[in-house]
């Protein structure tokens, strides 16, 4: 019986994990917070020993050390691979001038998106601490991307660097806008700040999508992922598809390719 692969996506906000079976299906999933945010360790006690761990880590050395300690405590000696972006892998060609500068999370997400939507031109918008946009052609060529502050970071920056504006979280902002989303302009400061930053996200995406469709002269599927996707989606006027497992799905493909080469 083939052992599953343990997949770990360590982002700046939290850490997601999954077990993938031989068919690259995610059969068990979970998430946990960073130590700095009071996040408890994951409960892996009921999981079988995997073939190995494949890790995308954009959260730094301290998180890498924590993951090593967690893996060693549960499965001593477990092989592990921290992925890096490459010039080409799993049907995706990296268009960055220096391919290894592309974040490993974005690289895995591109691979996952290519597999999820084969033969389609894609604009992939991922909403985390940063909002990232990736342009992926139907033949698997990643032609470039955009990086902007995420919704939460935009609001936090305004609250931190101005004297009279509040510092709002996405939970607070989402609640404020729940009954006011239909109105293009707001009548108090917290809602104005929440909506302004949200529309900045939506405006970036819609401009990028239209520019891409014009440049490629072809239909482009807009794919949304990440924690603020629901809120941003409500501000969009474009059709879109939601997919929240692109990075883990891409890691599953990378793991399967690596295991086949062992």
UniProtKB/Swiss-Prot annotation:
One record GO biological process: coenzyme A biosynthetic process
Cofactor: record remark: A monovalent cation. Ammonium or potassium.
Major location (coarse): cytoplasm
Entries under Pfam families matching the protein: Pan_kinase (PF03309)
Top-level division of the source organism's lineage: Bacteria
The keyword Kinase is assigned to this record: yes
Database matches in InterPro entries: ATPase_NBD, Type_III_PanK
GO molecular function list: ATP binding; pantothenate kinase activity
Gene3D superfamilies reported for this sequence: 3.30.420.40
SUPFAM superfamilies reported for this sequence: Actin-like ATPase domain
Membrane-spanning intervals of the chain: none
Pathway: Cofactor biosynthesis; coenzyme A biosynthesis; CoA from (R)-pantothenate: step 1/5
Active site residues of this protein: 105 (proton acceptor)
Keywords: ATP-binding, Coenzyme A biosynthesis, Cytoplasm, Kinase, Nucleotide-binding, Potassium, Transferase
Places the protein is found: Cytoplasm
A Gene Ontology cellular-component term: cytoplasm
Catalytic reaction annotation: (R)-pantothenate + ATP = (R)-4'-phosphopantothenate + ADP + H(+)
Cofactor field: NH4(+); K(+)
Presence of keyword Kinase: yes
Binding site for substrate: 96, 103-106, 189
Record EC number: 2.7.1.33
NCBIfam families: baf, PRK13328.1-4
Protein family per UniProt: Belongs to the type III pantothenate kinase family.
Assembly description: Homodimer.
Role played: Catalyzes the phosphorylation of pantothenate (Pan), the first step in CoA biosynthesis.
Name this polypeptide is given: Type III pantothenate kinase
């Amino acid at each position: 019986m083939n052992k599953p692969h343990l997949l770990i996506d360590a982002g700046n906000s939290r850490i997601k994990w999954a077990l993938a079976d031989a068919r690259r299906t995610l059969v068990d999933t979970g998430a946990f917070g960073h130590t700095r945010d009071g996040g408890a360790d994951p409960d892996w006690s009921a999981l079988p020993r995997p073939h190995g761990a494949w890790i995308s880590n954009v959260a730094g050395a301290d998180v890498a050390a924590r993951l090593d300690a967690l893996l060693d405590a549960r499965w001593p000696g477990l092989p592990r691979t921290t992925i890096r972006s490459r010039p080409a892998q799993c049907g995706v060609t990296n268009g960055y001038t220096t391919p290894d500068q592309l974040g490993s999370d974005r690289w895995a997400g591109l691979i996952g998106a290519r597999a999820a939507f084969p033969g389609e031109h894609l604009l992939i918008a991922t909403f985390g601490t940063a909002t990232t946009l990736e342009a992926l052609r139907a033949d698997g060529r990643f032609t470039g991307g955009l990086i902007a502050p995420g919704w939460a970071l935009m609001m936090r920056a305004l609250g931190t660097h101005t004297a009279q504006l509040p510092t709002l979280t996405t939970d607070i902002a989402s609640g404020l806008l729940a009954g006011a989303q239909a109105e293009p302009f707001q009548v108090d400061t917290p809602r104005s700040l929440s909506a302004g930053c949200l529309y900045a996200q939506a405006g970036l995406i819609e401009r990028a999508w239209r520019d891409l469709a014009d440049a490629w002269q072809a239909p482009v599927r807009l794919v949304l992922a990440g924690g603020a996707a629901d809120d941003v989606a409500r501000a969009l006027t474009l059709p879109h598809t939601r997919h929240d497992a692109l990075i883990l799905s891409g890691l599953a493909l990378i793991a399967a390719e690596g295991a086949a080469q062992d």
